[in-house]
Amino acid sequence: MIKKLKFVTLFVGGIAFLSACSDDAFNEIESSLPKDPNYNTDVYTATVSVSNIKEKAIQTNGLSGYLLGKYTQAPFGTKNATIASQVILPSANPRFGALTQADETAKNTPENEKVTEAYLYIPFFNINSSNSRATYNKDTEYQLDSIYGNKDASFAINVSELNYYLSNIGTDYQPKTYYSNDTDIPTHIGTSVASVTSYTISNKSITRYQFDDPKTQDDESKKEADVLAPGIRIPLSTSFFQTKIIDKEGSDELSNAEKFSKYFKGLVISTSNFSKDLMMLLNMAGAKIEIVYSYDTTNNGTKSTLKSRYELNLGGGITVNLLINSDENLSDSAKTYLSGALGQTASITIADTDITKFKEGNWLITDASLYLYVDNSVTYAKEPDRLFVYNAETGNVLVDYQYDPTSAAETAASSYLIHLGKLQKQNGKGAYYQLRITNHLVDLIKNSTNKNIPLGIAVASSVKVTTSGVYLDTSGANHKIALTTLATPLSTVIKDVQLIIHYTKAK
């Protein structure tokens, strides 16, 4: 942080000084500068080796967002994404209606709870998603984030019960990692809970209304209960949730969260029959099941039927993305393939001979940047705006990430512009990415104990996400990866990679 402040202070101070100088002052300064400096400045193109990395499977639990849908981009083929998620009991021993099940039995006053509606709601990401206190206005359109493909596409959604327990502890008693090619989930899909044959997403907020109280003259059903962020909201089977939840009031299955998670193991959400490609990044932290039910009550001898709403959470438990790729054609070994979700990354290694040359030559590195040049012979539906560079052995960010003066910018689009430059375009097409690794290279030269580790390169969904995870290569060995690449289906083909170094050296 201190280094950042020094950089900004010097930069701003320099601007102020230059602004205050007159032309005469500049001439005076120029005449006082040495005519023959005792150093040379030069540019050097270092030798790097680049390897394509094909992911057999990738960790897909513990993510900030989850993909659902279908996306096609030649030559990377078609990506399909399905979501499996636990359902979380918000509190132990829930009461449905005005009385507990024990009181209903003791007083012989059955409330006859009956499910009338049930819904699955999963919000999209939008400009307010990072604010947990954000409120939404009725019938208002919002700018959605991370929707890839055609937003007008229609598609089918199927929701089924999951009959496989998603444990958070593996057989080695360590936190369990779930992979994109998990085989237990697809073979344990149970009863269909919803089947919507044609669905189209909307960027409008979702308004829920209160329930009418027959004891009053007002019609409360016309009043707002709350307004939800734009998202997927589909009807679920009322009979399923009648049996699975409401009829279990007072039972052992609903007595605590652990027993509930083994009783109702979760849901699997899949899509099909797309009119056009559409891949959505969903905010599963805000996902929930809404159960609307009626119940009988007696007040001062007057019987009436009321309605209430009960919610189960999908956020807060284990969620897994199942990812399938098909029709890939990545045959040109001279090119570098980078693809998000279950896809491809690359490994870049700086030649040891060059590292030795930098050390022995006492070079003062002023800038070291990786340039990745885009292959424009490929037609891209949408090009990734950012790439991510990281330590390929640990999955951690480089030192340049920590000292980027734009790191505090509010949005990811405005952050880390020095270290992780945006895609530069020419004639409307992507030309190159510039990834500045100056501090990484300087540390490598100055510190003899630092290892010349390979650098991982991946498509980034957000440069603010620094979490690392695990992927399996084609041999089944596991390696580290930056998980920001998981939350996007976008891809690019790189035709050339160069490490260009600007330096000064004493004469």
How should these model regions be labeled?
Residues I2-K507:
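Secreted, disulfide-rich extracellular signaling modules
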